[in-house]
Amino acid sequence: MASAKKAVLGPLVGAVDQGTSSTRFLVFNSKTAELLSHHQVEIKQEFPREGWVEQDPKEILQSVYECIEKTCEKLGQLNIDISNIKAIGVSNQRETTVVWDKLTGEPLYNAVVWLDLRTQSTVESLSKRIPGNNNFVKSKTGLPLSTYFSAVKLRWLLDNVRKVQKAVEEDRALFGTIDSWLIWSLTGGASGGVHCTDVTNASRTMLFNIHSLEWDKELCEFFEIPMKILPNVRSSSEIYGLMKISHSPKAGALEGVPISGCLGDQSAALVGQMCFQDGQAKNTYGTGCFLLCNTGRKCVFSEHGLLTTVAYKLGRDKPVYYALEGSVAIAGAVIRWLRDNLGIIKSSEEIEKLAKEVGTSYGCYFVPAFSGLYAPYWEPSARGIICGLTQFTNKCHIAFAALEAVCFQTREILDAMNRDCGIPLSHLQVDGGMTNNKILMQLQADILYIPVVKPSMPETTALGAAMAAGAAEGVGVWSLEPEDLSAVTMERFEPQINAEESEIRYSTWKKAVMKSMGWVTTQSSESGDPSIFCSLPLGFFIVSSVVMLIGARYLSGMP
């Protein structure tokens, strides 16, 4: 019975899905796209100062090893032979920046996460010296000059971390986004690891020319980035190197398996949703929220605050495809904030129960601009607000407002995309962990006033990475021909409110967004000692107390 089961499975493909909140390793049947097994580990985020977001690159790498080991263990329990795994793909959180020592394999600083805001004053000073015109960066990269992207994070590390400066001087430093760090480590690390990235991840650094598909010398000179530390840029589907993890007893059977697919997480989801045609779009609900529309082989530049990015290049000799993207910084992260910071919920799943209890925000609106506002505003001065509170408001209303906020932000970027493309989307394909929340999906259909369509298997990001890996030349176990792609079962959510109510709620949300702007100004120092500022409140308290004591004595006539 067991041998018969093995015989029908055919070639398997694994996928590392390394996101902002968690790491997963998933294994798919390449003939049916069926998910056979997976394991997930939550990843810590560190907030050393206001606006700073970091992660430990070694913890990220260890989480990958753990997920591979546990998944292989589960496959063994299912009597599935892991030697059937013929390739591995990688999808990853984009923009997050790592610099490490190529001789020791040690990170030289924590990973600076895409959400991090410490580089705002760097962005402002750079914007004042853009050569020629304000489109210098955007015309080459498709991106606005923003704290979001890797170049300014790398610039900060070079300016402020002595270990990084010294390693660059001594030709020991390597830079990469999370995909580069993982592929280098998984293919041998300091003992011959492959230092590479793919076109989708490179296109998020602000150093990559999306027309020539090469690192841009002028951009590197503008940001003062030494090109010798940059990874080699490859397509999204080719053999980069072979797995070398013999130190891991349970995952050692994957030794020698090719890593042959690599896509930034949002591009991976586009592939996993099979959005291969011009005009097809998907929205992924993760830590942030990302709406991508395939624009085919042409670069479409937005006039409404969207990004132009590389969608995928599925083979060395295959054409590059582009996408328009609307990025929302905070989606699932707001649920984590309600859990970890406010203690309103004990688990992420609990928010659906709270929202269901009331079925309305009761006029409460939540703008979770914790890291400023991304598309379509690109407003770093914004901060989170909750408004419309009354004595009747309770945690259930706030939970509902948090879910609505995700949907309103999606509406904003969908409106921008419809204006850029000229043809409104008739429905929205969705994926990501938050799509398991049925109230969120129904709210999204109501607020967009179009149907929302969700695949029954929500792991489309990992699926996209697996498809790219399995289709690579030299692997060839996964066909991407339209006639060979597996049919996907979908769940459909139709709008249940009238258009007028949808518009009223949306217009009130827009008022709340306006109130969130202009809350902060750039701090004078990005690297100053925070302990200096910590002492100021105490100083003010002492001085004001002495003044009040003297005043009281004077008024009472005391000597």
UniProtKB/Swiss-Prot annotation:
Sn-glycerol 3-phosphate binds at residues 20, 94-95, 148, 265. Its EC number is 2.7.1.30. Beta-D-fructose 1,6-bisphosphate binds at residue 252. Zn(2+) binds at residue 501. GO terms for molecular function: ATP binding; glycerol kinase activity; metal ion binding. GO terms for biological process: glycerol catabolic process; glycerol metabolic process; glycerol-3-phosphate biosynthetic process; triglyceride metabolic process. It holds the Pfam family FGGY_N. PANTHER family: GLYCEROL KINASE, SUGAR KINASE. Belongs to the FGGY kinase family. This is Glycerol kinase. It comes from Bos taurus (Bovine). The lineage of its organism: Eukaryota, Metazoa, Chordata, Craniata, Vertebrata. The gene is GK.
